[in-house]
Design a protein with these regions (language model features):
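Exposed, low-structure sequence patches enriched in small/polar residues
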Residues: 1-169
Length: 169
């Protein structure tokens, strides 16, 4: 992973990821064309991301870096490309993500957080590489997620997700 960040809120990052997933238990993948079982799925991904967050300030701790000014708007654009044949990658994929975040203060009525995320999978990929909605599987509330929904319930190649959270202080 390489990250370049400026003082005025612009960040550019790029990364290369390789992973290999095997099926376990009663889960089996079969190719539709010939019925052959696929025992392992290997992917190699290259990502490029742009992020613009003007006016953000951070606090550095020993283990992490936390933003303390959540009032600034954030716009992010990321493209992830699956590389077929490179380092064992078996599938070509192209996933583009565009996200917008903004916090709006309402005076003595608290504040509202607005999140909008759009994703598009441009290539024909296996169902395990399709887009999943942000599902909250825990018993704790998490912002910008959907509760009371099962994992892997709605897979698609296009997604537009928005959420509004109102904290009344």
């Amino acid at each position: 992973t390489f990250t370049y960040e400026t003082d005025w809120g612009f960040r550019f990052d790029t990364s290369l990821r390789w992973q290999s997933n095997r099926t376990v238990g009663n889960l089996h993948y079969y190719r539709v064309s010939d019925g052959e079982e696929i025992r392992k799925i290997r992917t190699t991904d290259a990502s490029v991301g742009l992020n613009y967050n003007p006016g953000v300030t951070y606090v550095n701790t020993k283990q992490q870096r936390l933003p303390i000014n959540l009032d600034s708007p954030e716009i992010s654009l990321r493209h992830t490309m699956g590389l077929d044949g490179f380092m064992g990658g078996q599938y070509q994929s192209n996933l583009t993500t565009l996200g917008i975040y903004k916090r709006q203060w309402l005076g003595s009525f608290g504040y509202m957080d607005f999140n909008i995320v759009g994703k598009a999978q441009w290539s024909k990929v296996p169902f395990t590489m399709l887009i999943q909605p942000p599902v909250n599987l825990s018993i704790f509330e998490q912002e910008a997620t959907i509760s009371m929904m099962k994992d892997w319930e709605f897979l698609s190649d296009r997604q537009l997700f928005w959420s509004v959270a109102w904290d009344m202080n």
